[in-house]
Amino acid sequence: SVFLAVVALASARTVRAADPVAEARQAWQLLDYIAVDYPAAIQNGQVVDAVEYAEMQEFTASVGIKLAALPPDSGHAARLAKAKQLQGLVAERADAEQIARSAGALASELLTVYKIEAAPAAVPDLARGAALYAQQCTACHGATGRGDGPAAGGMDPPPIAFTDADRAKHRSALSLYQVISQGLPGTAMMSYAHLSNDDRWALAYYTGGLAYDAAARDQGAAIWADDEQARRVFPDLAALSGATEADVSKTLGADRARAITAYLRGEPGAVA
């Protein structure tokens, strides 16, 4: 179960802390998972899925354990305090946006402090991503990314439905890359670290585009061509890879954010 996986991760912390970047990367992944999946557990301050809520509680506890195991530096105590605050917000069943902000801010700090890889070295090859998806992913996630592949039956938790627009808007290409690289403890999602970095980024961008249709991509292409503000939001591949539709909507508004995200997930070379 996810609970047992988290306990196992926690018990191994002193060993894993020998590699601070790996430990920080795992903490980042948990924070990203919390930011994306918390709304499935809590809505309007009420528990709507007890199993999901238990996972959120365990994941926030695990983040604190992992950060505590990292070598102290000048920001160590402050990061531990932020992790404790996030744990308290989950315990209080705080609003999803507040959870996403808190988890996202701490995750961004980890990227910077531990220099976690946050962008592809070259423009992702979407055709390669599509081919890899067909070979490696359809059994669980389904041919169109709906989480309905032939091997998905009985999986607990079920495979991610990449076409779920509500969750997709909180998920960056970077978060998909990290899950592809490391797997997700407590689920059937294994690590694909045997693939090259380029292949993993190609898969991340391809799966990150499955929630968007051709109309949204076309609208995004038109906006990108004419909207200088939109182009300033995405100056390079690093900015694009770390961006979520939800974050971009704070600057561009919901409609433009969705269209631009749809276009650039399919045409990342536009920012290169």
Q: Where are each of the predicted segments found?
A:
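Mature extracytoplasmic or organellar-lumen-exposed domains after removal of signal/transit peptides
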Residues: 18-126, 131, 135-136, 216-272
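Short Fe-S-cluster ligation motifs
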Residues: 168-184
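Periodic glycine anchor positions in long extracellular repeat architectures
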Residues: 142-147, 183
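Bacterial N-terminal signal peptides
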Residues: 1-10
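Axial heme c-ligation environment in periplasmic c-type cytochrome domains
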Residues: 50, 89-98, 158-160, 179-210, ...
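The canonical Cys-X-X-Cys-His
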Residues: 129-144, 176, 203-207
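Gly/Gly-Pro-rich "capping" loops immediately C-terminal to redox-active cysteine motifs
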Residues: 46-54, 145-173, 191, 224-225
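Sec/Tat signal peptide C-region and signal peptidase I cleavage site
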Residues: 11-17
